[in-house]
Amino acid sequence: MSTSRSTRHQPGWGKPVRLMLRLMLMGVGLGVITGSALKLLAPQVEKGQLSLPSWLALPGSENAPAPGASTQPKAAAQPSSQPWGNSLGKFEAKREMTALTERWRQLAAQQKDLKVSAFMLVLDDGRFAALGADMPLPAASSIKTPILLATLELLDSGQLRWNEPLTLTKTVVGGGAGWMATKPLGTRFPTHEVATEMIRISDNTATNLLIERVGGKDVINTRFKALGLTATAVNNWLPDLEGTNTTSARDLARSIALVDTGKALSTRSRDLFREVMGTSVTNRLLPGGLLKGLGGEQGKPDDSLMIKGYRVYNKTGDIGIAYADAGLIELPDGSRAVAAFVVKGPFNDPRSTELIRDMAAAMAPVLQPKPAPRRTS
């Protein structure tokens, strides 16, 4: 009897190779599909409009859940409890602080022969006080604030360079405050120096140089009207001791607020505006009055206010028959207010400046922020 060997076919390498090729092709296909899907969905993930599953989010990324955290959909984020948030605020009077307005009225009534224009607005919530806020009065040097704004508008439009030289001519030489008038005709000053000296020491010749560079009185007045400064006008070269240049408390406050709320000027020019306004050396009216209301020492208003968390960027005016001061006030909680005062009265009458200080002092109670809540661990 013969024995027979099994004739069953022995498996070779064909099937495993084919299986591996199929798996590789499937992997490549799935990779292409997944990559294309992620590319299409990436913008939505980046904007937070679509959450990645926990197994796909990178550790430490915004979309990655904390260890042990629930993967259930999150409720919509609640608005910040911070009252001013990221808003720059608005020049919009919403709710009158009648007690402050009445206090101003009482102070003004004690000096019946003085004409008063006063305005204050908290940019972050719209609280305001006003007394004769739109009354046109002699602007004195307070008009230099809107002139600075008009100058920086040219910078933004590319019609002016910050280092452009301005030439001293006989037309623009002005008496009174400043040193530029003492230089020989033909002297050239860079625009940044002219603008700074106009605010820092209230140089009248510097102011006239900028009025001329903007295009003259008619052109700058047109710009004022376009900015909504309806009571503000340059009718004479500085120093304008006759008081023909006019403004109002609301206009002065508006010219500052338009910059700080981003309604006028670029971010860079806004920074220049603040930088220049911060150089003003006269601080006895608005800053001094505010410090008085806060109960501080009167030696150095700016330094004393800073210790208390306040900062005032202001510009004054003084032609004897009229005094003014207007500025941006930064408060300890980060919110901001604008305030302006213009008083017309007898020549060099100390009651005018004292009235501005008293009215500024009256603002202190409403500008003191509430204590910050204590953090709980």
Q: Which residues does each predicted region cover?
A:
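Penicillin-recognizing serine hydrolase domain
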Residues: 2-114, 185, 192-195, 209-377
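Acidic/histidine-rich, surface-exposed loop or edge segments in extracytoplasmic proteins
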Residues: 76-89, 122-132, 178, 201-203, ...
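N-terminal post-signal-peptidase region of extra-cytosolic proteins
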Residues: 102-104, 132-136, 150, 324
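Short, conserved catalytic-motif segment at the N-terminal edge
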Residues: 109-136
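Active-site SXXK
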Residues: 126, 137-168, 339
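Short alpha-helical patches at coil-to-helix transitions and adjacent helical residues
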Residues: 142-145, 200-207, 246-253
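Active-site-proximal loop and beta-strand segments within enzyme catalytic domains
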Residues: 155-197, 205, 210
